A protein has these predicted regions:
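Small-residue (Gly/Pro/Ala) motifs that create kinks and tight helix-helix packing interfaces
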Residues: 28, 60, 144-153
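Juxtamembrane helix-start elements in MFS-like secondary transporters
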Residues: 37-46, 93, 97, 127-131
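Short hydrophobic/small-residue motifs within alpha-helical transmembrane segments
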Residues: 50-51, 139-141
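C-terminal transmembrane helical hairpin of 12-TM major facilitator-type secondary transporters
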Residues: 70-115
């Protein structure tokens, strides 16, 4: 961790995760109050979000083996940014919001594998510390994202606004 590269990767990891968790921390009220889903349907919707996570992880792992991990991470992060912007503008269309939810969760887990590969690659002599540090970056992103996603709600803006804040992080 003596060079700049691992720190840039850790920062990108934190911001990328933060962007998703700005939005995902408030997904239940977004789905019920904006998209019109019932509270009873949330279990099924969260299972769909989980399928997105699994698919994103599997796909990006294979892509990171075949292509440059930095490119895979950048494309996944770009997909998250666009999907979060679309959530902000189109969340009232229920089926589209579910599709965007799956894209965002796929992107969250798609970006993780290549970032971990990059961090270990650029942490020569400190691979174990790099691998441990990436978990810290994920968790910091989660906490900071949830906090920042709640800020527009604190001032009375609607449940679509955490997605807008998240797109800025992404």
């Amino acid at each position: 961790l003596k060079t700049q590269a691992p720190w840039l990767i850790l920062g990108a990891t934190m911001l990328g995760n933060g962007g998703v968790f700005c939005w995902y921390s408030y997904i239940s009220p977004l789905l019920t109050q904006v998209s019109g889903f019932s509270a009873e349907s949330l279990t099924v919707l969260m299972v769909l979000a989980g399928f997105g996570m699994v698919a994103g992880n599997l796909i990006s792992g294979r892509l990171s083996d075949k292509y440059m991990p930095g490119r895979v991470a950048a494309i996944a992060q770009g997909m998250i940014c666009v999907a979060l912007l679309l959530v902000f503008f189109l969340a009232q269309i229920s089926w589209l919001n579910v599709l965007l939810m799956c894209l965002c969760t796929a992107g969250l887990f798609a970006v993780s594998s290549p970032q971990q590969v990059l961090l270990i690659r650029y942490s020569k002599g400190g691979e174990m510390l790099g691998a441990a540090s990436v978990q810290v970056a994920f968790n910091l992103g989660n906490a900071i994202g949830a906090y920042c996603g709640g800020l527009p709600l604190e001032v009375g803006l609607g449940y679509k606004y955490p997605a807008l804040i998240g797109s800025g992080f992404a």
